[in-house]
Design a protein with these regions (language model features):
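Extramembrane terminal tails and long inter-domain/linker segments of multi-pass membrane proteins
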Residues: 1-46, 147-162, 192-228, 301, ...
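Transmembrane-helix bundle segments that line or gate the permeation/cavity pathway
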Residues: 2-24, 64-75, 80-83, 90-221, ...
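Long, contiguous internal "core" modules enriched in hydrophobic/ aromatic residues
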Residues: 35-40, 44-64, 155-354, 451, ...
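C-terminal TM-helix exit segments that contain a strictly Trp-centered aromatic cap at the helix terminus
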Residues: 60-66, 134-144, 320-327, 389-399
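Hydrophobic alpha-helical transmembrane segments
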Residues: 91-98, 163-182, 273, 349-360, ...
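Transmembrane alpha-helical segments in integral membrane proteins
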Residues: 99-111, 177-194, 280-290, 360-376, ...
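Extracellular/periplasmic helix-loop-helix junctions in multi-pass membrane proteins
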Residues: 257-261, 333, 371-372, 397-417
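Central hydrophobic cores of alpha-helical transmembrane segments
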Residues: 377-387
Protein backbone atom coordinates (compact mmCIF):
# COMPACT_ATOMS: atom_id res chain seq x y z
CA UNK A 1 0.00 0.00 0.00
CA UNK A 2 1.29 3.45 -0.91
CA UNK A 3 2.11 5.80 1.96
CA UNK A 4 -0.02 8.48 0.34
CA UNK A 5 -3.11 6.27 0.07
CA UNK A 6 -5.68 6.87 2.85
CA UNK A 7 -6.63 3.91 5.06
CA UNK A 8 -9.70 1.93 4.03
CA UNK A 9 -11.77 3.04 7.03
CA UNK A 10 -10.92 6.74 6.73
CA UNK A 11 -13.99 9.02 6.60
CA UNK A 12 -14.70 10.63 3.27
CA UNK A 13 -13.63 14.28 3.20
CA UNK A 14 -16.27 16.52 1.61
CA UNK A 15 -14.76 19.07 -0.71
CA UNK A 16 -16.13 22.58 -0.60
CA UNK A 17 -17.79 24.00 -3.67
CA UNK A 18 -15.43 26.27 -5.62
CA UNK A 19 -15.67 30.04 -5.29
CA UNK A 20 -15.20 30.23 -9.07
CA UNK A 21 -16.40 27.71 -11.63
CA UNK A 22 -13.69 25.61 -13.35
CA UNK A 23 -12.13 26.41 -16.70
CA UNK A 24 -12.12 30.19 -16.50
CA UNK A 25 -9.25 32.39 -17.66
CA UNK A 26 -8.60 36.11 -17.29
CA UNK A 27 -10.15 36.70 -20.71
CA UNK A 28 -13.27 34.59 -20.13
CA UNK A 29 -14.00 36.30 -16.81
CA UNK A 30 -13.66 39.74 -18.38
CA UNK A 31 -15.74 38.81 -21.43
CA UNK A 32 -18.57 37.28 -19.43
CA UNK A 33 -19.01 40.11 -16.92
CA UNK A 34 -18.34 43.02 -19.30
CA UNK A 35 -20.70 41.64 -21.95
CA UNK A 36 -23.67 42.13 -19.61
CA UNK A 37 -23.00 45.87 -19.71
CA UNK A 38 -21.55 46.44 -23.19
CA UNK A 39 -22.99 43.96 -25.68
CA UNK A 40 -25.93 42.02 -24.25
CA UNK A 41 -29.36 43.26 -25.48
CA UNK A 42 -31.78 44.51 -22.85
CA UNK A 43 -34.32 41.74 -23.30
CA UNK A 44 -38.04 41.65 -22.64
CA UNK A 45 -37.57 40.61 -19.01
CA UNK A 46 -35.41 43.61 -18.16
CA UNK A 47 -37.73 46.02 -19.98
CA UNK A 48 -40.82 44.62 -18.25
CA UNK A 49 -39.15 44.74 -14.84
CA UNK A 50 -37.91 48.27 -15.38
CA UNK A 51 -41.36 49.42 -16.54
CA UNK A 52 -42.96 47.95 -13.42
CA UNK A 53 -40.45 49.51 -11.05
CA UNK A 54 -40.64 52.86 -12.85
CA UNK A 55 -44.41 52.80 -12.35
CA UNK A 56 -43.89 52.24 -8.63
CA UNK A 57 -41.47 55.17 -8.53
CA UNK A 58 -44.17 57.35 -10.05
CA UNK A 59 -46.49 56.13 -7.27
CA UNK A 60 -43.83 57.25 -4.77
CA UNK A 61 -43.60 60.72 -6.34
CA UNK A 62 -47.39 61.10 -6.28
CA UNK A 63 -47.52 59.95 -2.65
CA UNK A 64 -44.85 62.44 -1.56
CA UNK A 65 -46.44 65.26 -3.58
CA UNK A 66 -49.84 64.60 -1.99
CA UNK A 67 -48.18 64.45 1.43
CA UNK A 68 -46.59 67.88 0.89
CA UNK A 69 -49.92 69.31 -0.29
CA UNK A 70 -52.16 67.83 2.42
CA UNK A 71 -49.76 67.10 5.30
CA UNK A 72 -49.02 63.97 7.34
CA UNK A 73 -52.72 63.61 8.15
CA UNK A 74 -53.07 61.46 5.03
CA UNK A 75 -51.18 58.75 6.94
CA UNK A 76 -52.65 56.62 9.68
CA UNK A 77 -50.66 58.30 12.46
CA UNK A 78 -52.55 59.94 15.30
CA UNK A 79 -52.20 60.69 18.98
CA UNK A 80 -50.55 58.78 20.65
CA UNK A 81 -49.17 56.88 17.62
CA UNK A 82 -47.03 59.65 16.15
CA UNK A 83 -44.54 57.22 14.60
CA UNK A 84 -46.03 54.98 11.93
CA UNK A 85 -44.90 53.49 8.65
CA UNK A 86 -42.33 56.24 8.06
CA UNK A 87 -40.12 55.22 10.99
CA UNK A 88 -40.81 51.51 10.45
CA UNK A 89 -39.65 51.80 6.84
CA UNK A 90 -36.65 53.96 7.77
CA UNK A 91 -35.30 51.41 10.26
CA UNK A 92 -35.99 48.53 7.86
CA UNK A 93 -34.19 50.12 4.90
CA UNK A 94 -31.18 51.15 6.98
CA UNK A 95 -30.90 47.58 8.24
CA UNK A 96 -30.96 46.11 4.74
CA UNK A 97 -27.86 48.09 3.78
CA UNK A 98 -25.71 46.55 6.51
CA UNK A 99 -24.91 43.31 4.70
CA UNK A 100 -23.21 45.22 1.89
CA UNK A 101 -20.83 46.91 4.30
CA UNK A 102 -20.15 43.67 6.16
CA UNK A 103 -19.41 41.76 2.93
CA UNK A 104 -17.26 44.55 1.50
CA UNK A 105 -15.31 45.66 4.56
CA UNK A 106 -15.27 43.02 7.30
CA UNK A 107 -14.95 39.99 5.02
CA UNK A 108 -12.25 41.85 3.05
CA UNK A 109 -10.24 42.43 6.23
CA UNK A 110 -10.75 38.77 7.18
CA UNK A 111 -9.46 37.75 3.71
CA UNK A 112 -12.58 35.77 2.83
CA UNK A 113 -12.32 35.05 -0.90
CA UNK A 114 -15.98 34.10 -1.30
CA UNK A 115 -16.96 37.77 -0.92
CA UNK A 116 -15.40 38.60 -4.30
CA UNK A 117 -18.37 37.66 -6.49
CA UNK A 118 -21.03 39.34 -4.38
CA UNK A 119 -19.41 42.43 -2.88
CA UNK A 120 -20.07 44.77 -5.83
CA UNK A 121 -23.85 44.43 -6.02
CA UNK A 122 -24.04 44.15 -2.21
CA UNK A 123 -22.35 47.57 -1.97
CA UNK A 124 -24.78 48.95 -4.56
CA UNK A 125 -27.63 47.49 -2.52
CA UNK A 126 -26.31 49.39 0.51
CA UNK A 127 -26.31 52.72 -1.33
CA UNK A 128 -29.78 52.22 -2.78
CA UNK A 129 -31.17 51.13 0.60
CA UNK A 130 -29.68 54.21 2.29
CA UNK A 131 -31.22 56.39 -0.44
CA UNK A 132 -34.64 54.84 0.24
CA UNK A 133 -34.17 55.17 4.01
CA UNK A 134 -33.20 58.84 3.73
CA UNK A 135 -36.59 59.72 2.27
CA UNK A 136 -38.55 58.80 5.39
CA UNK A 137 -37.04 61.06 8.08
CA UNK A 138 -37.52 64.00 5.71
CA UNK A 139 -41.18 63.37 4.96
CA UNK A 140 -41.85 62.17 8.51
CA UNK A 141 -41.20 65.68 9.82
CA UNK A 142 -44.10 66.95 7.71
CA UNK A 143 -41.99 69.83 6.41
CA UNK A 144 -39.21 68.35 4.27
CA UNK A 145 -38.26 71.82 2.99
CA UNK A 146 -37.11 72.64 6.54
CA UNK A 147 -34.74 69.66 6.74
CA UNK A 148 -31.67 71.91 6.75
CA UNK A 149 -32.56 72.84 10.35
CA UNK A 150 -31.12 69.46 11.37
CA UNK A 151 -27.64 70.33 10.07
CA UNK A 152 -25.15 72.30 12.19
CA UNK A 153 -24.34 75.27 9.98
CA UNK A 154 -23.47 78.86 10.96
CA UNK A 155 -26.49 81.15 10.76
CA UNK A 156 -27.21 84.75 11.71
CA UNK A 157 -30.06 83.59 13.95
CA UNK A 158 -27.68 81.48 16.02
CA UNK A 159 -29.96 78.42 15.83
CA UNK A 160 -28.16 75.16 16.57
CA UNK A 161 -29.50 71.59 16.38
CA UNK A 162 -30.60 69.87 19.56
CA UNK A 163 -27.75 67.39 19.89
CA UNK A 164 -29.59 65.46 22.60
CA UNK A 165 -32.22 64.49 20.04
CA UNK A 166 -31.86 61.03 18.44
CA UNK A 167 -33.10 62.57 15.18
CA UNK A 168 -29.87 64.57 14.98
CA UNK A 169 -27.86 61.46 15.79
CA UNK A 170 -29.54 59.74 12.85
CA UNK A 171 -28.55 62.59 10.52
CA UNK A 172 -24.87 62.20 11.39
CA UNK A 173 -24.90 58.39 11.45
CA UNK A 174 -26.73 57.91 8.16
CA UNK A 175 -24.86 60.66 6.28
CA UNK A 176 -21.50 59.27 7.43
CA UNK A 177 -22.55 55.75 6.52
CA UNK A 178 -23.74 56.80 3.08
CA UNK A 179 -20.61 58.84 2.34
CA UNK A 180 -18.13 56.13 3.34
CA UNK A 181 -20.13 53.45 1.51
CA UNK A 182 -20.22 55.56 -1.67
CA UNK A 183 -16.46 56.17 -1.58
CA UNK A 184 -15.77 52.51 -0.89
CA UNK A 185 -18.00 51.43 -3.79
CA UNK A 186 -16.59 53.97 -6.25
CA UNK A 187 -12.93 53.24 -5.50
CA UNK A 188 -13.58 49.54 -6.01
CA UNK A 189 -15.14 50.36 -9.39
CA UNK A 190 -12.14 52.26 -10.81
CA UNK A 191 -10.26 49.32 -12.43
CA UNK A 192 -13.51 47.95 -13.89
CA UNK A 193 -14.52 51.34 -15.28
CA UNK A 194 -11.18 51.47 -17.08
CA UNK A 195 -11.82 47.97 -18.47
CA UNK A 196 -15.23 49.06 -19.80
CA UNK A 197 -13.65 52.21 -21.25
CA UNK A 198 -11.09 50.18 -23.17
CA UNK A 199 -13.59 47.58 -24.41
CA UNK A 200 -16.46 49.92 -25.33
CA UNK A 201 -17.22 50.32 -29.05
CA UNK A 202 -19.69 53.17 -28.62
CA UNK A 203 -18.11 56.64 -28.45
CA UNK A 204 -20.60 57.82 -25.83
CA UNK A 205 -19.78 54.84 -23.58
CA UNK A 206 -16.06 55.49 -24.03
CA UNK A 207 -16.49 59.10 -22.88
CA UNK A 208 -18.67 58.23 -19.87
CA UNK A 209 -16.56 55.33 -18.62
CA UNK A 210 -13.36 57.23 -19.40
CA UNK A 211 -14.46 60.19 -17.29
CA UNK A 212 -15.53 57.94 -14.42
CA UNK A 213 -12.27 55.93 -14.57
CA UNK A 214 -10.39 59.15 -13.68
CA UNK A 215 -7.33 58.34 -15.76
CA UNK A 216 -6.79 54.81 -14.48
CA UNK A 217 -4.03 53.09 -16.45
CA UNK A 218 -3.28 50.09 -14.26
CA UNK A 219 0.27 51.16 -13.43
CA UNK A 220 2.04 49.85 -10.34
CA UNK A 221 1.61 53.24 -8.67
CA UNK A 222 -2.12 53.22 -9.41
CA UNK A 223 -2.54 49.74 -7.95
CA UNK A 224 -0.52 50.64 -4.86
CA UNK A 225 -2.65 53.70 -4.13
CA UNK A 226 -5.83 51.82 -4.95
CA UNK A 227 -5.05 49.01 -2.52
CA UNK A 228 -4.00 51.45 0.22
CA UNK A 229 -7.18 53.51 -0.17
CA UNK A 230 -9.38 50.40 -0.31
CA UNK A 231 -7.81 49.00 2.86
CA UNK A 232 -8.17 52.34 4.66
CA UNK A 233 -11.84 52.67 3.73
CA UNK A 234 -12.47 49.06 4.75
CA UNK A 235 -11.08 49.93 8.17
CA UNK A 236 -13.30 53.02 8.36
CA UNK A 237 -16.40 51.16 7.20
CA UNK A 238 -16.03 48.27 9.65
CA UNK A 239 -17.07 50.18 12.81
CA UNK A 240 -19.97 51.67 10.84
CA UNK A 241 -21.54 48.21 10.64
CA UNK A 242 -21.90 48.35 14.42
CA UNK A 243 -22.36 52.06 15.00
CA UNK A 244 -25.06 53.05 12.50
CA UNK A 245 -27.79 50.69 13.60
CA UNK A 246 -26.73 51.18 17.21
CA UNK A 247 -27.48 54.89 16.79
CA UNK A 248 -30.78 54.03 15.10
CA UNK A 249 -31.67 51.80 18.06
CA UNK A 250 -31.06 54.78 20.36
CA UNK A 251 -34.13 56.41 18.77
CA UNK A 252 -36.06 53.94 20.89
CA UNK A 253 -33.73 52.90 23.71
CA UNK A 254 -33.25 56.41 25.14
CA UNK A 255 -37.02 56.92 25.40
CA UNK A 256 -39.02 55.91 28.47
CA UNK A 257 -41.79 54.24 26.45
CA UNK A 258 -42.42 50.63 27.61
CA UNK A 259 -40.99 48.21 25.07
CA UNK A 260 -38.38 50.71 23.91
CA UNK A 261 -36.39 51.49 27.04
CA UNK A 262 -34.13 48.44 27.04
CA UNK A 263 -30.38 47.88 26.78
CA UNK A 264 -30.68 44.86 24.47
CA UNK A 265 -31.65 47.07 21.53
CA UNK A 266 -28.18 48.02 20.15
CA UNK A 267 -26.82 44.47 19.62
CA UNK A 268 -30.31 43.22 18.80
CA UNK A 269 -30.77 45.87 16.09
CA UNK A 270 -27.30 45.25 14.61
CA UNK A 271 -27.89 41.49 14.38
CA UNK A 272 -31.31 42.10 12.86
CA UNK A 273 -29.81 44.48 10.31
CA UNK A 274 -27.22 41.93 9.16
CA UNK A 275 -29.95 39.27 9.16
CA UNK A 276 -32.26 41.23 6.86
CA UNK A 277 -29.32 42.49 4.80
CA UNK A 278 -28.07 39.02 3.91
CA UNK A 279 -31.64 38.00 3.12
CA UNK A 280 -31.83 40.88 0.64
CA UNK A 281 -28.45 39.95 -0.89
CA UNK A 282 -29.85 36.46 -1.53
CA UNK A 283 -33.03 37.98 -2.95
CA UNK A 284 -30.88 39.87 -5.48
CA UNK A 285 -28.16 37.27 -6.13
CA UNK A 286 -30.42 34.34 -7.01
CA UNK A 287 -32.35 36.03 -9.87
CA UNK A 288 -29.17 37.81 -11.04
CA UNK A 289 -27.15 34.62 -11.48
CA UNK A 290 -30.05 32.96 -13.28
CA UNK A 291 -30.93 35.86 -15.60
CA UNK A 292 -27.37 36.48 -16.82
CA UNK A 293 -25.90 32.98 -16.56
CA UNK A 294 -23.51 33.86 -13.73
CA UNK A 295 -23.70 30.50 -11.95
CA UNK A 296 -19.92 30.05 -12.38
CA UNK A 297 -19.28 33.28 -10.47
CA UNK A 298 -22.06 33.19 -7.85
CA UNK A 299 -21.77 29.52 -6.94
CA UNK A 300 -23.50 27.31 -4.39
CA UNK A 301 -20.59 28.10 -2.05
CA UNK A 302 -21.75 31.72 -1.90
CA UNK A 303 -25.40 30.84 -1.35
CA UNK A 304 -24.53 28.28 1.31
CA UNK A 305 -22.29 30.70 3.21
CA UNK A 306 -24.89 33.46 3.12
CA UNK A 307 -27.51 31.04 4.39
CA UNK A 308 -25.22 30.12 7.29
CA UNK A 309 -24.72 33.80 8.17
CA UNK A 310 -28.50 34.26 8.07
CA UNK A 311 -28.95 31.32 10.41
CA UNK A 312 -26.36 32.65 12.88
CA UNK A 313 -27.75 36.18 12.97
CA UNK A 314 -31.28 34.79 13.12
CA UNK A 315 -30.37 32.95 16.31
CA UNK A 316 -29.06 36.21 17.80
CA UNK A 317 -32.34 37.91 16.88
CA UNK A 318 -34.26 35.06 18.53
CA UNK A 319 -32.14 35.53 21.65
CA UNK A 320 -33.05 39.23 21.57
CA UNK A 321 -36.76 38.36 21.53
CA UNK A 322 -36.25 36.07 24.52
CA UNK A 323 -34.30 38.69 26.49
CA UNK A 324 -37.01 41.28 25.84
CA UNK A 325 -39.65 39.08 27.44
CA UNK A 326 -37.36 37.83 30.19
CA UNK A 327 -36.34 41.32 31.29
CA UNK A 328 -39.95 42.53 31.19
CA UNK A 329 -41.06 39.86 33.68
CA UNK A 330 -37.80 39.74 35.65
CA UNK A 331 -37.84 43.49 36.27
CA UNK A 332 -41.32 43.35 37.75
CA UNK A 333 -42.19 46.60 35.97
CA UNK A 334 -45.95 46.37 35.51
CA UNK A 335 -45.89 48.52 32.38
CA UNK A 336 -43.33 46.30 30.66
CA UNK A 337 -45.18 43.16 31.76
CA UNK A 338 -48.45 44.53 30.40
CA UNK A 339 -46.84 45.41 27.06
CA UNK A 340 -45.34 41.91 26.77
CA UNK A 341 -48.79 40.45 27.36
CA UNK A 342 -50.25 42.81 24.76
CA UNK A 343 -47.84 41.49 22.16
CA UNK A 344 -49.11 37.98 22.84
CA UNK A 345 -52.81 38.65 23.33
CA UNK A 346 -53.49 42.25 22.24
CA UNK A 347 -55.13 43.64 19.10
CA UNK A 348 -51.88 43.36 17.12
CA UNK A 349 -50.90 39.88 18.35
CA UNK A 350 -51.27 38.37 14.86
CA UNK A 351 -48.39 40.58 13.66
CA UNK A 352 -46.22 39.31 16.50
CA UNK A 353 -46.96 35.65 15.79
CA UNK A 354 -46.29 36.27 12.09
CA UNK A 355 -42.85 37.72 12.83
CA UNK A 356 -42.05 34.77 15.12
CA UNK A 357 -42.94 32.43 12.26
CA UNK A 358 -40.89 34.40 9.72
CA UNK A 359 -37.84 35.29 11.83
CA UNK A 360 -37.42 32.36 14.22
CA UNK A 361 -39.23 29.22 13.07
CA UNK A 362 -38.76 29.31 9.28
CA UNK A 363 -34.97 29.99 9.35
CA UNK A 364 -34.42 26.84 11.44
CA UNK A 365 -34.73 24.94 8.17
CA UNK A 366 -31.29 26.35 7.32
CA UNK A 367 -29.71 23.84 9.69
CA UNK A 368 -30.22 21.28 6.90
CA UNK A 369 -27.75 21.26 4.03
CA UNK A 370 -30.39 20.19 1.51
CA UNK A 371 -32.36 23.34 2.28
CA UNK A 372 -29.30 25.57 1.99
CA UNK A 373 -28.52 24.08 -1.42
CA UNK A 374 -32.06 24.41 -2.76
CA UNK A 375 -31.95 27.69 -4.69
CA UNK A 376 -35.71 28.17 -5.04
CA UNK A 377 -36.31 27.49 -1.35
CA UNK A 378 -33.52 29.88 -0.37
CA UNK A 379 -35.11 32.61 -2.46
CA UNK A 380 -38.50 32.10 -0.81
CA UNK A 381 -36.91 32.07 2.65
CA UNK A 382 -35.07 35.33 1.95
CA UNK A 383 -38.39 36.98 1.09
CA UNK A 384 -40.01 35.53 4.22
CA UNK A 385 -37.18 36.82 6.44
CA UNK A 386 -37.34 40.31 4.96
CA UNK A 387 -41.09 40.34 5.54
CA UNK A 388 -40.56 39.19 9.11
CA UNK A 389 -37.97 41.89 9.80
CA UNK A 390 -40.38 44.56 8.55
CA UNK A 391 -43.06 43.14 10.87
CA UNK A 392 -40.56 43.26 13.74
CA UNK A 393 -40.04 46.98 13.22
CA UNK A 394 -43.81 47.47 13.01
CA UNK A 395 -44.34 45.63 16.30
CA UNK A 396 -41.60 47.62 18.06
CA UNK A 397 -42.84 51.01 16.84
CA UNK A 398 -46.61 50.67 16.79
CA UNK A 399 -47.56 48.28 19.60
CA UNK A 400 -45.37 50.14 22.09
CA UNK A 401 -47.10 53.43 21.27
CA UNK A 402 -50.66 52.09 21.29
CA UNK A 403 -50.41 51.02 24.95
CA UNK A 404 -48.62 53.72 26.94
CA UNK A 405 -48.65 54.49 30.68
CA UNK A 406 -52.13 56.04 30.91
CA UNK A 407 -55.14 54.01 29.66
CA UNK A 408 -56.97 57.17 28.63
CA UNK A 409 -54.16 57.87 26.14
CA UNK A 410 -54.35 54.45 24.46
CA UNK A 411 -55.12 54.39 20.76
CA UNK A 412 -55.25 52.26 17.62
CA UNK A 413 -53.23 52.53 14.45
CA UNK A 414 -54.75 51.88 11.06
CA UNK A 415 -52.43 52.45 8.06
CA UNK A 416 -53.97 54.16 5.05
CA UNK A 417 -53.56 53.77 1.30
CA UNK A 418 -50.85 56.44 1.33
CA UNK A 419 -48.82 54.53 3.92
CA UNK A 420 -48.73 51.47 1.68
CA UNK A 421 -48.18 53.46 -1.53
CA UNK A 422 -45.10 55.15 -0.03
CA UNK A 423 -43.68 51.79 1.06
CA UNK A 424 -44.33 50.22 -2.35
CA UNK A 425 -42.86 53.29 -4.02
CA UNK A 426 -39.56 52.93 -2.19
CA UNK A 427 -39.48 49.22 -3.08
CA UNK A 428 -39.90 50.30 -6.69
CA UNK A 429 -37.15 52.91 -6.37
CA UNK A 430 -34.78 50.34 -4.88
CA UNK A 431 -35.52 47.80 -7.63
CA UNK A 432 -35.32 50.40 -10.42
CA UNK A 433 -31.88 51.52 -9.25
CA UNK A 434 -30.77 47.87 -9.23
CA UNK A 435 -32.07 47.38 -12.79
CA UNK A 436 -30.10 50.43 -13.96
CA UNK A 437 -26.99 49.38 -12.03
CA UNK A 438 -26.90 45.88 -13.53
CA UNK A 439 -26.99 47.28 -17.08
CA UNK A 440 -24.78 50.31 -16.51
CA UNK A 441 -21.95 48.98 -14.34
CA UNK A 442 -20.38 45.54 -13.77
CA UNK A 443 -22.41 43.78 -11.06
CA UNK A 444 -19.40 41.58 -10.25
CA UNK A 445 -15.90 42.99 -9.68
CA UNK A 446 -13.91 42.09 -12.81
CA UNK A 447 -10.49 42.98 -11.39
CA UNK A 448 -11.04 40.96 -8.21
CA UNK A 449 -12.34 37.97 -10.16
CA UNK A 450 -9.16 38.05 -12.27
CA UNK A 451 -7.11 37.81 -9.08
CA UNK A 452 -9.29 34.90 -8.04
CA UNK A 453 -8.54 33.09 -11.32
CA UNK A 454 -4.82 33.22 -10.54
CA UNK A 455 -5.30 32.08 -6.96
CA UNK A 456 -7.63 29.23 -7.94
CA UNK A 457 -5.21 28.00 -10.62
CA UNK A 458 -2.33 28.03 -8.12
CA UNK A 459 -4.39 26.11 -5.56
CA UNK A 460 -5.38 23.56 -8.22
CA UNK A 461 -1.72 22.96 -9.04
CA UNK A 462 -0.91 22.62 -5.35
CA UNK A 463 -3.63 19.97 -4.92
CA UNK A 464 -2.24 18.03 -7.85
Amino acid sequence: MSVTQPPLNAPEIRRLDPVLGPGHTYASVTDKIASVVLTRPLGIGWLAGFALTFTLVMVLFISIAWLIIKGVGIWGINIPIGWGFAIVNFVWWIGIGHAGTLISAILFLLNQKWRTSINRFAEAMTLFAVACAGIFPLIHTGRPWMAYYMFPYPSTMGIWPQFRSPLIWDVFAVSTYGTVSLLFWFIGLLPDLATLRDRAKNRFQQLIYGALAMGWRGSAQHWHRYQSAYLLLAGLATPLVLSVHTVVSFDFAVAIVPGWHTTIFPPYFVAGAIYSGFAMVLTIAIPLRKAYGLEDFITMRHLDNMAKVMLATGLIVAYGYFVEFFMAFYSGNKFDVFLAQQRLHGPYSHYYYALILCNILTPQLLWFEKVRRNVALLFVMSLVINTGMWLERFVIVVISLTRDFVPSAWGRYQPTFWDFSTLLGTLGLFAMLLFLFVRGLPAIAISEMRELVGQESHSDRDRK
